[in-house]
A protein has these predicted regions:
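Entry/capping segment at the start of metal-dependent catalytic domains
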Residues: 1-32
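Conserved beta-strand scaffold positions in the cores of enzyme catalytic domains, especially
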Residues: 3-5, 38-40, 115
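Short, glycine/acidic-enriched loop or turn micro-motifs at the edges of active sites
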Residues: 10-12, 120, 144
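Short glycine-rich, Thr/Ser-proximal phosphate-binding strand/loop in the N-terminal lobe
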Residues: 27-46
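Short, glycine/polar-rich helix-capping loops at beta-to-alpha or helix-loop-helix junctions
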Residues: 48-51, 132-133
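Conserved DEDDh/DEDDy metal-dependent 3′-5′ exonuclease domain
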Residues: 56-128
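A structural motif
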Residues: 126-136
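Single conserved hydrophobic/aromatic residue that forms the stacking wall/gate
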Residues: 137-146
Length: 146
């Protein structure tokens, strides 16, 4: 069975306020083992990045200026994820942003029925603990998904 572990970075916290996706990372797992297949995309958001968001992910408007816009990576992204199960930490956030981008491109939305959200699992396993996925990383560069 194929599962895809997915994460995004954004220009801010609210897709409803026009914030955009600036990075997508996807790692493939088959039968619960990581394979050598992954997808990593930087995206030009065509808008400024909130200072608070930039403090978290370190990506700047200058760095993203020559990257493709979301419409230009949509097919590559959807071809990679197909209809497979997505594993996402705080899934409503990422799916909300992905569906806002899909809507701008006239593409049907992703269904939460194909998503496992690890945030409720983390809260169940570690009640009262900080549930931020980024705190699980000890590597200085979480962008190395190879």
């Amino acid at each position: 069975m194929r599962h895809l572990v997915l994460d995004t970075e954004t220009t801010g916290l609210s897709a409803a306020e026009g914030h955009r996706i600036i990075e997508i990372g996807v790692i493939e797992m088959v039968n619960f083992s990581v394979t050598d297949r992954s997808l990593h995309l930087y995206i030009n958001p065509e808008r400024d990045i909130d200072v608070g968001a930039q403090d978290i992910h370190g990506l700047s408007s200058e760095f993203l200026a020559d990257k493709p816009v979301f419409a230009d990576i949509l097919t590559e992204f959807t071809d990679f994820i197909k209809d497979d199960l997505l594993v996402i930490h705080n899934a409503p956030f990422d799916i909300g942003f992905l569906n806002a981008e899909f809507s701008r491109c006239g593409h049907p939305p992703l269904s939460m029925e194909r998503v496992i959200d690890t945030l409720p699992l983390a809260r169940q396993k570690y009640p009262g603990a900080q549930a931020s996925f980024c705190l699980l990383y000890t590597s200085p560069s979480p962008r190395d998904i190879s």
